């Protein structure tokens, strides 16, 4: 049973790093009521900026896969395994969506994805070893910071890039739900030093992934 689960998670990890992700939900599309700018072709500079932002988002989803896989393997609680598994499935949707958008923008994922994945896996295992409530608190804080990060991307994306905006908006909704679920399952509020360290690591990752 454990071996089967380990093989399944290994397969998911390979797909995360290689960009071969499965969607359980269709790609979000712009809603007419939210489109405030006419459909126009993005300039080369706008496409490059949008691609950089979506590459950062894609890296975030690679890390999310690793984190939740590790936390799922670390807990002995069936109910918490279900929480992490559901989040991982929805994060895999995000992974596939951002990958598709990068292709449409004639761009590529980060070349450092194996590094990001490995680092996040180690962090997830460390969080899991601190106990279920700390692990859930880590999940909630991760999602809270990702939500703020997505808000900033909605401010930065070109106004005419409706496709990227639709993806980011749905991702934001999902991340908020994941964070709420983690706290409702018993997550502990992390101390300020831990939250500050997470923000610092996130800044390094986002600044690097935008370009590489």
UniProtKB/Swiss-Prot annotation:
The keyword Cell membrane applies. Pathway: Cofactor biosynthesis; ubiquinone biosynthesis. Its main location: membrane. Fe cation 1 binds at residues 61, 91, 94, 175. This is 3-demethoxyubiquinol 3-hydroxylase. It catalyses: a 5-methoxy-2-methyl-3-(all-trans-polyprenyl)benzene-1,4-diol + AH2 + O2 = a 3-demethylubiquinol + A + H2O. Keywords: Cell membrane, Iron, Membrane, Metal-binding, Monooxygenase, Oxidoreductase, Ubiquinone biosynthesis. It comes from Paraburkholderia phytofirmans (strain DSM 17436 / LMG 22146 / PsJN). It comes from the Bacteria. The keyword Metal-binding applies. CDD domains: DMQH (cd01042). Transmembrane segments: none annotated. Its cofactor is Fe cation. Belongs to the COQ7 family. Binds 2 iron ions per subunit. InterPro entries: COQ7_proteobact, Ferritin-like, Ferritin-like_SF, Ubq_synth_Coq7. GO terms for biological process: ubiquinone biosynthetic process. Catalyzes the hydroxylation of 2-nonaprenyl-3-methyl-6-methoxy-1,4-benzoquinol during ubiquinone biosynthesis. HAMAP family: COQ7 (MF_01658).
């Amino acid at each position: 049973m454990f071996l089967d689960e380990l093989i399944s998670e290994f397969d998911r990890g390979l797909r995360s790093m290689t960009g071969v992700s499965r969607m359980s939900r269709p790609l979000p599309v712009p809603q007419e009521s939210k489109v405030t700018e006419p459909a126009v072709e993005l300039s080369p500079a706008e496409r490059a900026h949008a691609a950089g932002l979506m590459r950062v988002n894609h890296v975030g989803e690679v890390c999310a896969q690793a984190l939740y896989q590790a936390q799922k393997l670390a807990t002995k609680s069936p109910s918490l395994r279900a929480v992490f598994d559901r989040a991982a499935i929805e994060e895999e949707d995000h992974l596939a969506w951002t990958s598709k958008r990068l292709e449409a923008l004639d761009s590529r994922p980060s070349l450092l994805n194996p590094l990001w994945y490995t680092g996040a896996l180690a962090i997830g295992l460390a969080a899991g070893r601190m106990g279920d409530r700390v692990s859930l608190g880590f999940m909630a804080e991760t999602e809270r910071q990702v939500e703020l990060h997505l808000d900033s991307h909605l401010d930065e994306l070109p106004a005419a890039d409706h496709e990227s905006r639709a993806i980011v908006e749905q991702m934001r909704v999902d991340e908020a739900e994941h964070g709420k679920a983690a706290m409702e399952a018993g997550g502990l509020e992390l101390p300020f030093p831990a939250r500050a360290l997470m923000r610092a690591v996130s800044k390094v990752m986002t600044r690097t992934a935008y370009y590489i």
